[in-house]
A protein has these predicted regions:
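Two-component/phosphorelay signaling modules centered on CheY-like receiver
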Residues: 11-30
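Short amphipathic alpha-helix used as the core "switch/output" element in two-component signaling
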Residues: 40, 61-73
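Conserved phosphotransfer microenvironments
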Residues: 48-65
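C-terminal output helix
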Residues: 86, 104-113
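CheY-like receiver
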Residues: 118-146
Length: 146
């Protein structure tokens, strides 16, 4: 089961997203209203997924960098009621993996997370296959000496 942490100043938004994630089979190991306490939850639980309100990211861009540095495999989802192209581009450049739109629609939230997880796994497998291919000795077609 994938573990998740929610960071949002709105208790209502945290509660709704918590319900969506729990109903979707995720283990919400913590939720908080500040990035500082959110980072403490990451240290304690090492979640696979972090959902962070847009305001939290925009007020403290270092939080995304810190998560990417210390938990590089953790997927970061920006949560907001609106996204424009500039925001999405800036968020991607910071390392945000996906976007969750308020008001929450359970199917959309769960599909967004699932599709992002699948894409990440595919990228990791491709990278491993590429590494394995580069590390494999070249076969020149000559018979083995023996």
């Amino acid at each position: 089961m994938l573990k998740a942490v929610i960071i949002d100043t709105s208790a209502v938004a945290r509660g709704l997203l918590n319900t969506v994630l729990l109903d979707g089979g995720y283990d919400v190991v913590g939720q908080t209203h500040t990035c500082a306490s959110g980072l403490a939850l990451l240290i304690k639980h090492h979640p696979h997924i972090v959902c962070i309100a847009r305001e939290q990211i925009e007020n403290g861009e270092d939080v995304v960098r810190e998560i990417k540095t210390n938990w590089p495999k953790t997927l970061i989802f920006m949560v907001s009621s609106e996204f424009d192209a500039a925001t999405v581009q800036a968020a991607h450049a910071m390392g945000v993996n996906g976007f969750i739109v308020k008001p929450f629609k359970a199917d959309t939230v769960l599909n967004t997370i699932r599709n992002t997880v699948i894409a990440m796994v595919k990228r990791q497998r491709a990278a491993l296959a590429k590494e394995a291919g580069a590390a494999a000795p070249a076969d020149d077609g000559a018979p083995a000496a023996g």
